[in-house]
């Protein structure tokens, strides 16, 4: 084995020289240069600095403007809440531990950090799935006369929390476990060992199938069908400039959504699966660090994609930030009037929210 396994940790370094120490008790500067820990702390500070305001602003603006309190926006708010979970439950602790060079918060802190980071990430992931299903139901109309209402939104919220808990809770109760990973300053699922009594293998397979592959298939299916529906509407009314604009807008939105989903999760999932299927092979501490912390950046670009592309929300946000006035009101108004409408794709169905 090209690593050192101990009680509730795995260090990606063989302890031939005797320098390997518990990541709960000693700085891990023998893994990487101390400057790397400082850089990690600075990166986490940047995520907090940007992630907290943009997600808090999402909640505040929606509460401030009654017209934004629509059933679909409940899911978008859920996305913001999930991102705040990641900011407070994961980013702050990682910034603090990276300043010390090891997971100074101990075993309990590792469980809490791993749980909140996993919970927030999974709530966000399943919120995107619910959004994809809602867009498909409204635009493609597999059920005639379907209208997404408050009851559907509440069921969607409950679904995201149940699925997230189904992934984040088991490691706390003995099905797998949370351990420090990468540079040993943050905690995640144990992909690294076959620790006796924790059934890591079955949990990792369950997690990949139910909490990665299935969401991926659903997102691709729903947005693929949505894009086809918009193309069909545009083909039926080729003379309509607004319909052509609808096709372009939705195409751009779909591409951004799918690419962001892949950029966020595929590197982390790919590296985690490689480590799981090649346990004991040689890899450095940065091998898992880069994809893990890149995935955390979803707390920033998720709200930018799913909320800031919403014309109505953008108008309300500018109004809130500018003390009740929107200096770009004419431009926003012109943009709103040109909002796409088609016989088979309504304007509310085409816009991101």
Swiss-Prot record:
GO terms for molecular function: 11-cis retinal binding; G protein-coupled photoreceptor activity. It comes from Chelon saliens (Leaping mullet). Residues 62-73, 134-152, 225-252, 309-353 are cytoplasmic. The lineage of its organism: Eukaryota, Metazoa, Chordata, Craniata, Vertebrata. One of its GO terms (biological process) is absorption of visible light. Glycans are attached at residues 2, 15, 200. The modification N6-(retinylidene)lysine is found at residue 296. Phosphorylated on some or all of the serine and threonine residues present in the C-terminal region. Contains one covalently linked retinal chromophore. It is found in: Membrane; Cell projection, Cilium, Photoreceptor outer segment. Residues 334-353 have a biased composition (Low complexity). The record marks 113 as: Plays an important role in the conformation switch to the active conformation. InterPro entries: GPCR_opsins, GPCR_Rhodpsn, GPCR_Rhodpsn_7TM, Opsin, Retinal_BS, Rhodopsin, Rhodopsin_N. A motif ('Ionic lock' involved in activated form stabilization) lies at residues 134-136. GO terms for cellular component: membrane; photoreceptor disc membrane; plasma membrane. Residues 330-353 are annotated as: Disordered. The keyword Membrane applies. The chain crosses the membrane at residues 37-61, 74-96, 111-133, 153-173, 203-224, 253-274, 287-308. The keyword Glycoprotein applies. Belongs to the G-protein coupled receptor 1 family. Opsin subfamily. Residues 1-36, 97-110, 174-202, 275-286 are extracellular. Disulfide bonds join 110-187. This is Rhodopsin. A lipid is attached at residues 322-323 (S-palmitoyl cysteine). It is a multi-pass membrane protein.
